[in-house]
Amino acid sequence: GLLDGLLGTLGL
């Protein structure tokens, strides 16, 4: 997700 910065695909 955006917050995790790892996947960046969840947008969470």
Curated annotation (Swiss-Prot):
Keyword annotations from UniProtKB, A to Z: Amidation, Amphibian defense peptide, Secreted
Positions of modified residues (Leucine amide): L12
Biological processes, Gene Ontology terms: defense response
Entry GO terms, CC: extracellular region
Primary location: secreted
Membrane-spanning parts: none
UniProt note on tissues of expression: Expressed by the skin dorsal glands.
Compartment annotation: Secreted
Disulfide topology: none
PTM entry text: Isomerization alpha-beta of the Asp-4 residue in caeridin 1.2; a cyclic succinimide may be formed between Asp-4 and Gly-5 residues in caeridin 1.3.
Role, per record: Caeridins show neither neuropeptide activity nor antibiotic activity.
Protein name as it appears in the record: Caeridin-1.1/1.2/1.3
Organism of provenance: Ranoidea xanthomera (Northern orange-eyed tree frog)
